[in-house]
Amino acid sequence: MIIEPVLGGGGCIPATKEYLVGIEEFCRKNNSLFILDEIVTGFRFRYGCIYNKMNLDPDIVTLGKIVGGGFPIGVICGKDEFMKYANTSTLSKSSRAYIGGGTFSANPLTMMAGNTTLSKLKNNGNMFYRKLNNLGTETRKMLDKKFDGRVITTGIGSLFMTHFLKDTIYEIKNATDAAKCNTKKLHDYHFHMIANDGIFFLPGKLGALSSVHTKSDITAMAKSTDGYLTGFKK
């Protein structure tokens, strides 16, 4: 079973620890692999993965994005008992798992960028992540206050997403709830910020803060939101 600890494209919704523990227990009882997709969450909120903090024990973990230092990358980590099937030096081709390879596999530039990024995060982790996560909390509070009950802002740490509510939706607990929200208004809101204030969002998607963002960026987003709300109220 493959699961994201925080839904990315599904609405930026963090799973509860109890839910993830339940999924892991289900996998153990049914002799299934418990696989965590931490491509978005790995090294996003802390130096490491979410599963470490939640005391989960996944069989396989996937990583990407941050561990590549801004360059394309995909990483598969796992327990020896499973990863041994990808070992080309000990198993014959017919006995091992297929691992695709190519010109850009283990690209030296990506490896250097990723290693440099992780080294900097390791050395400055506590201060860096505290600042970044606090900015995310401040952003979510600002958006909820500005829209005054007309949206729910989901997310965790430095990730956030604004959901424009419809009459039948009062909470966002899963991807089904998120899909029932007014995506047109979300697109309109994002296009407003892009066109009028140069604040870029991939329309209809989540927001992700980085180390270069400061409180002034949150202030700019708040000002742009005020401009959007002028027309929104009409």
Regions found by a protein language model. Name each.
Residues 2-234:
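Conserved N-terminal phosphate-binding loop of PLP-dependent enzymes in the Aspartate aminotransferase
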